[in-house]
Amino acid sequence: MLLAIDAGNTEVTLGLFSGEDLERSWRITTRPDRTADEWAVMLRALFQEAGLDITETDRSILASVVPLATEAIADGVVIATGTVPTIVTAANLPIRLEVDEPLTVGADRMVNTLAASRLFGVDTIVVDFGTATTLDCITKDGRFLGGIIAPGIRTAGENLVRRAAKLSATELGPPERAIGKRTDECIRAGLVFGAADAVDGMVRRIKAEWPTREVPKVIATGGLAPLVAKFSAEIEEVHPDLTLQGLRLASQWLAQGGGR
């Protein structure tokens, strides 16, 4: 069994794979101050609650964009499972980073594009709705071309509420209309329609600059992807577990001798 962990700025997503099948996944709030022992206790509790035997885990892999949490998570995995997690870096993935500063590309972006190139086999734009909304570009032959980083939907909403005294937090959901009749409706429409229209506009700009003759496929991932995709003209498919699948593919490639 493979334990795949994606440590993001807002959430840590964990997935347990049996072969190619994702047996179970969890989402936990990111807390950089958690210790390795706390992570071990949490992992054991999650497995126990799901009726799973954590000792059956024989491999683990970690992609993290939270440096302060990386070591504690990795050590917690060692304590709980007895496996030493592979830490994803640009050096151990089968993609070519055709960017000016490859060391600054987040591990989550790299595994997303790895998954896209391996699972779909065509030029792809991956839209990931997380703390930031990222649009990443990968060719079918594994060339990472770069992309766009924009404020995430929840990040934008929280910042709006924090800076506007008369606005309060609003639950995200499908807006009923563009012209809101209540303040919460107005905020919801602004966040969701704004995100969808922004993504559509950015995708069109990316397509206009695409360096090959192919029209790239547009897929979305992240917790809010199903919501925003309903209102997007450019997003073709939603794959909520794309990052975990990318981690599975990375682990598989490394286990077969890749990266040496």
Q: PLM ranges: what are they?
A:
Residues 43-58, 202-216:
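Phosphate/pyrophosphate-binding loops at sites that engage ATP/ADP/AMP, CoA/4′-phosphopantetheine
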Residues 2-6, 61, 124-128, 219:
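Short glycine-aspartate micro-motif
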Residues 16-17, 73-76, 138-140, 231-233:
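Short amphipathic alpha-helical segments
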Residues 2-48, 142-168, 173-177:
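Short glycine-rich, Thr/Ser-proximal phosphate-binding strand/loop in the N-terminal lobe
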Residues 2-4, 30, 157-260:
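ATP-binding/phosphotransfer module of carbohydrate and carboxylate kinases, centering on a glycine-rich
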Residues 75, 83-163, 192-205, 227, ...:
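Phosphate-binding/catalytic loop of phosphoryl-transfer enzymes
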